[in-house]
Amino acid sequence: MTILCIETSTSVCSAAICKDGTPIKQCICREGSNHARLLPRYIEELLSFTREQGLSIDAVALSEGPGSYTGLRIGTSTAKGLCYGLNVPLIPVPTLEVLCEAAKEQSPITNHQSSILLPMIDARRMEVYTAINGETKAIVVENEESITNHPYLQIVPSGKESPITNDTAVYYFGDGAAKCANVFSRPNWHFIPDIVPEAQYVGILAESGKRKVESVELAYYEPFYLKEFVAAQSHVKGLV
């Protein structure tokens, strides 16, 4: 299965081609929010690459959020247009899962099976989007207890208690994690810098058996904003 993958949820813009769960080409820019300019160029380059390799696109995978409102809208509109044009399904992948996959591949964590991976995407001010055991929430970060005592994260869907204890090794990362480093003081909480979601990891997760059957109805699909988008009111005279 050949999947065209898109990741625009943060300031990093990337697109990739994955073949049978293995990334074979990726285009990425880490230097700021230029998604509207870069993404069409990346898509054109990747489609040209697939033609040269004799491949045809079987699906488009998208990092669905949460994240930057503008970035998510750019990625979603591009992905939906490609799906309509190529007549292929859209496979959405949660961005926080993509971030965890990036941490497993890029960081020195060797015991991630027994540790807690705490992905954090910036949600402005002192808020982050994070997830424990699949429960994605926007959380105001004041200290470690903001996470461990959060009512939505204390009990996971299975009914078991929260896995974070005083002795649990916790690794936190993502573009929302740096501002937490100054308020987290436990010695077993470790900040990992420079971990970002990338399109190649979207493809790896999309190829899993679970995701392959979760394509969506294109006409009604919207990105996972989590927090309601509120447009800033203009203060220019004459504009409503």
Regions found by a protein language model. Give the residues of each.
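Phosphate-handling active-site elements
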Residues: 48-55, 84-93, 108-112, 213
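Stable alpha-helical structural segments in soluble proteins, enriched in small hydrophobic residues
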Residues: 46-50, 85, 103, 199-209
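Acyltransferase
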Residues: 192-240
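A general structural signal for well-ordered alpha-helical segments in protein cores
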Residues: 36-40, 79, 199-203
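Surface "functional belts" at beta-alpha junctions
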Residues: 22, 31-34, 89-197, 225, ...
